[in-house]
């Protein structure tokens, strides 16, 4: 459980650093200065965790927590395997931008399907599930835009982090719920 708590705290830090650098690049671009400042401000909002919502304790709390943790672990294992596979293909010279994009789109669909398959019994569990799903829905839109782009670039680079607050909020809500249930 301690390993999971550390992972829940570490993952958002890494993601924040990655996406903050994207925001800085977008904000420092010489074109459309006023628009970039607005985009950077919007992006900062997308990186903030919403307040923890209170939910009543139920007999099914442990069940839902375990399912959400299992989902997170399975997704992370799948994502690690995908990254290793992509790296291997890159090293072998077999990775094309189209193939990489397709594999990442497949990963997003898998995350969404895994979430849909969760048999959550509590309001809090379904709330967390919904936050995760909203995040993955946005990622699906980002990859679709990239697929349609002629230069493999997003029209608005900050679109890539839209909805990150949903992901961070889901992680924080789950961690809070775990701590609350452990008491």
Q: Where in this protein do the model-derived segments appear?
A:
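C-terminal motif of bacterial Sec signal peptides marking the signal peptidase cleavage site
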Residues: 24-27
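Bacterial signal peptide processing site
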Residues: 29-31
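C-terminal amphipathic alpha-helix
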Residues: 40-102, 135-183
């Amino acid at each position: 459980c301690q390993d999971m708590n550390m992972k829940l705290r570490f993952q958002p830090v890494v993601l924040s650093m990655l996406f903050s650098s994207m925001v800085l690049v977008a904000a420092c671009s010489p074109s459309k200065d006023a628009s970039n400042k607005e985009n950077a401000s919007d992006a900062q909002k997308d990186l903030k965790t919403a307040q923890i919502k209170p939910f009543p304790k139920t007999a099914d709390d442990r069940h839902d927590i375990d399912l959400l943790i299992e989902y997170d672990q399975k997704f992370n294992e799948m994502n690690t395997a995908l990254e290793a596979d992509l790296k291997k293909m890159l090293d072998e010279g077999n990775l094309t931008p189209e193939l990489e994009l397709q594999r990442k789109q497949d990963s997003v669909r898998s995350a969404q399907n895994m979430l849909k398959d969760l048999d959550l019994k509590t309001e809090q569990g379904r709330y967390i599930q919904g936050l995760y799903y909203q995040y993955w829905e946005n990622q699906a839109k980002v990859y679709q835009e990239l697929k349609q782009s002629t230069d493999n670039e997003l029209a608005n680079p900050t679109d890539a982090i839209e909805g990150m607050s949903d992901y961070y909020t889901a992680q924080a809500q789950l961690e809070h719920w775990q701590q609350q249930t452990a008491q």
